């Protein structure tokens, strides 16, 4: 329900929404879902890990190993790379009152398909995000979700794969992704400013926001 809450909070003017990434108390531990939650946090208004002194509730990436740790670190680094885009979209939010995250039906209120993907949302003006919120299929070793692409051309944010949605009602997709990827689509012609990851002496430099 976290992607749904994150998107629909905008309906009541609550654009600065966050969640306890990885959960907080109770529940059960699932490392792959922890990594998927990191990915949702990367494409949320506020990216906030929740933790405590207990190893069970500690959500920091150094509490994990292997492919889960790698996926978590990649998500945090991507969030840092997205800072110029986030700054631009938050300036837009302050100027125009448009939140960073919007349900799909905001831009196409008369399209019934826009209401059929409650976990999918627009992230700023250029990106669509369809988070994976279930465990990976044990056979395929991939996570699965359904996505809807409005009419037009779209590109996978990570590998540049092209998707064409040539119907006015849009295109529904069954999307499978490895643990280190989450379904994010950029519209054709979109501009997504990113910054390079700082290394060496530049990590704490004033030039590195």
Residue spans for each PLM region:
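Catalytic-domain carbohydrate-binding cleft regions of carbohydrate-active enzymes
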Residues: 1-188, 195, 199-203
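A glycine-rich beta-turn/hairpin centered on an aromatic-Pro dipeptide
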Residues: 206-209
């Amino acid at each position: 329900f976290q992607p749904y809450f994150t998107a629909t909070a905008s309906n009541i003017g609550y654009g600065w929404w966050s969640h306890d990434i990885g959960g907080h108390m109770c529940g059960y531990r699932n490392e792959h879902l922890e990594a998927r939650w990191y990915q949702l946090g990367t494409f949320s208004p506020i990216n906030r890990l929740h933790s405590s002194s207990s190893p069970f509730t500690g959500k920091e990436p150094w509490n994990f190993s292997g492919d889960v740790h790698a996926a978590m670190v990649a998500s945090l680094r991507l969030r840092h790379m997205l800072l110029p885009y986030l700054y631009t979209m938050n300036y837009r939010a302050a100027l125009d009152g448009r939140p960073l995250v919007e349900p799909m039906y905001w831009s196409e209120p008369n399209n019934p398909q826009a209401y059929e993907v409650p976990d999918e949302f627009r992230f700023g003006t250029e990106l669509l995000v369809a988070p994976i919120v279930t465990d990976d299929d044990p056979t395929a070793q991939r996570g699965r979700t359904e996505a809807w692409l409005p009419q037009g051309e779209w590109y996978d944010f990570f590998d540049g794969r092209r998707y064409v949605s040539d119907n006015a009602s849009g295109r529904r997709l069954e999307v499978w992704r490895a643990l280190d990827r989450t379904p994010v689509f950029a519209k054709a012609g979109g501009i997504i400013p990113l910054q390079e990851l700082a290394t060496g002496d530049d990590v704490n430099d004033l030039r590195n926001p």
